Amino acid sequence: MSQSRAVVITEASSPVALATAARLAAGGDLVLMGTRRTHICEEFAARLRSGGAAAFAAHLDLADPPSIDRFVNTADYLIGAVDVLVSAAGLADGLWVGAQHLAAQVIPPMIDNRHGDVVLISPELAGASPAGAHRMLEAWVGGLDAEFVGTGVRASIVRSTGQVPPDDVGCLIAAAISAPDRMHLRVVDVIPPVLTPTLAQERRRR
């Protein structure tokens, strides 16, 4: 990667979000994790920094508009204009509106810079499964597609019908945002692994 990207990850205390943060930070990106469970992400970010990565954590409650506004100011101070937004909200507990409110604040600079990525993570991968979430995600990414025409900004969904190892999801998110500008991985469908007897035994030994 020739240049570090400024990355925001929401609801960042989930296993998938933590794995994504670790992978992107290890690759040289500036990563800010937004979460209500700041103690988890602050400790995790400190471990990443001890290894030379640029990772930070800040309080973010997507159900509280003032918290979102404070988080955006914190992001501007710590990592600058956001290049990548990874939304792992799961769209539960009233977070849907807040997730869009945050996106509406960080997307305009991407459009101005004619480069950026917005990645939505399906609720199963984010550790939740609210009714109708898939339809909401499809509607959201469809709206973003229309907004991003000709701007150089891309919208993607990483989704699955079941649980997938967090590290694998982090790898796919990294691939989506690292694709050349001429490519757009709009939908990444992850097929959950088949739990064969041998694989089940290996997992029990871990």
Where are these regions (language model features)?
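A glycine-rich helix->loop->beta "capping" turn
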Residues: 2, 51-56, 73-87, 91-95, ...
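C-terminal helical subdomain
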Residues: 101, 153, 157-206
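A short, exposed helix-loop element centered on a Lys and neighboring polar residues
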Residues: 103-104, 142
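Catalytic loop of short-chain dehydrogenase/reductase
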Residues: 111-112, 117-142, 146-149, 159-163
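Rossmann-fold cofactor-recognition segment
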Residues: 48-66
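Conserved glycine-rich Rossmann-like NAD(P)H-binding loop of the short-chain dehydrogenase/reductase
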Residues: 28-43
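Active-site loop of short-chain dehydrogenase/reductase
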Residues: 5-6, 80-84, 97-99, 110-124, ...
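Conserved glycine-rich cofactor-binding loop
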Residues: 13-15
